[in-house]
Amino acid sequence: MARPALRISFLQACLLGALGLVLARAAQLQLFQGEQWARKAERQRTTRDTLEARRGSIYDRRGTPLAVTQEFYHVGVAPNEVQDRREVVRRVARALRVPAGELERRMRAERYVYYHGPFTATDIEPLRKLKGVHTEGSYRRSYPTQSIAAPVVGRLDADSGSGGSGLERALDDLLTGRPGEAVFIRDRRGRRLESPARRIREPVPGNDAWLTIDFTLQDIAERALEGALRDLDAEGGDIVVLDPRSGEVLAIASRQATGVGARPTAFTDPFEPGSTAKLFTAAALLRLGRVDSTAAVSGHCGKLVVATSARATRTITDTHKECGDLTLSEAITVSSNVAMAQFSQQLTVTEQFTALRDFGFGSPTGVEFPSESRGALKPPEQWQATYTRASAAMGYEFGVTALQLASAYGAIANDGVLLAPTLVREVRAHDGRLLYRHQPEPVRRVVSSRVAATLMRYLRQVVSTEGTARGAQLANYEVAGKTGTARRFVDGRYQGYTASFAALFPADDPQLVIVVKINNPTKGSYYGGATAAPLTKQMLERMLAARNTTLDLRRLQEAEPVPLAIPEVRPPDAVARVSRVAWPYRDRDTTAAE
């Protein structure tokens, strides 16, 4: 009897000991390691992930959306949380436009029924208060204006989602928000359920940017350029519209006749500006006092031989065969290469180089755009003393972008002060707080007010019956400007032409600088006066007719109308003189030589 009782007591003691150990372990886990094990369990059934932040939007100067981030939603249903299954099935199926039977079957078979959108806020509004129905927001980028201003605005990188080109890339840090963080629940297999259990940190949306671009002017510029490339059978071109009083870029268009998409060549591709650069040599001559209004050189009947070395020469020619003397003003008006080559010899190499550099050539403008070209301006020690000075005076042996050329002409229109061009007018936080507003940024004074006024007189004369830009004349407003025609340097040799025109409008108080550049027009004339100048006139007429542009029409209306100048003619020279008037419907082959 004693032995069985002893065994029972021993077993009871063992059981009590084991129970004690279990209780002790439980107490240890609960009291001393409970928090640690709870965290481990939490990690096993949950995961942390980032919450996407809304990317800031891009607008034109008047609030027209150019790039916006649209929120869309995904929807999930947790069957074990649903209280009224029939009602949930009915309302979810209707809102998401899915078969009710399919939803019912999935709710019986799956722990979490997930519908990947995109669904709009309107779609999910009826579901927001349903028990067991969860929504998850996400974002996608859209461009409401389609192709208009597309190279400027840019696009996102398809892989990273960050800015890939254009202003999307240049302003990426401003537009990108700060991601949030949330805890998501995992199922038994470790798969993440798409409904967040809780948010740890809310995402902060990115900033919004208002550009200097005027959507209406941009549309006019792009349509005009597209039509010109078609009508002139040209390879490509650029148009820049700039406010000379602020440096704000109002429109900037680039097109190529071949290839996919449009490259922003107005920022990236330098070209030899041709006769549009004659104004900068004139500016240096006037600023340094090397010429006055009476100083003149011979036109040499349109042909001048210039030494390029001790044994070599080159011949400079003019389309206009002027045999008499030409003043600086007249040389600009008729765009005489021969006269400007002679005038340039009154400047030293360093003086001419400095003049071009001061107008911004050879350096990036600093505009908010990736991969902007600095152009090409070789240092003075690489200039050939005589011929390079003559070449530079004619717009050769250095390269400029269309934006640089517009900025330089803007300095003349702005009383001689060069301003830094900009594409960004304003930046605001997601809650509307103003973070940045552009103010005109002077770079340097390039010429005095007096010299700037003199140059403006020269440019007004170019757009007259005596000048090379007769095709840019408007009926009621005066336009100032300078034409350009230059051989194109392609693949190591000169082939084809670049036609250009730099305009200031209105001439008495410029509100706009317009630079038009056409690459290798092959149908009709290739001269800037016969291609780019009439295109500028066409654009100005459309801008004046448009509503809601940056043009101050009240100021224009207060100005005294300027009629087209029709010269007095006499029978002996009637045909020659009348053919030089800028008739609205000129024959395409009637060109202005320059």
List each language-model region with its residue ranges.
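Conserved, well-ordered alpha-helix/loop/beta-strand core segments that scaffold catalytic motifs
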Residues: 193-237
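Short beta->alpha transition motifs characteristic of CBS
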Residues: 53, 68-74, 251-257
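Hydrophobic alpha-helical transmembrane signal-anchor segments
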Residues: 2-36
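Short, small/polar residue-rich loop motifs at catalytic or cofactor-binding pockets
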Residues: 50-54, 179, 233-237, 421
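Beta-lactam-recognizing serine transpeptidase/beta-lactamase-like catalytic domain environment
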Residues: 187-200, 237-275, 280-521, 528, ...
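Small/polar-residue-rich segments within soluble enzyme cores
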Residues: 31-32, 77, 81, 87-98, ...
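Short, gly/Ser/Thr-rich active-site loops of penicillin-recognizing serine hydrolases
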Residues: 433-440, 530-592
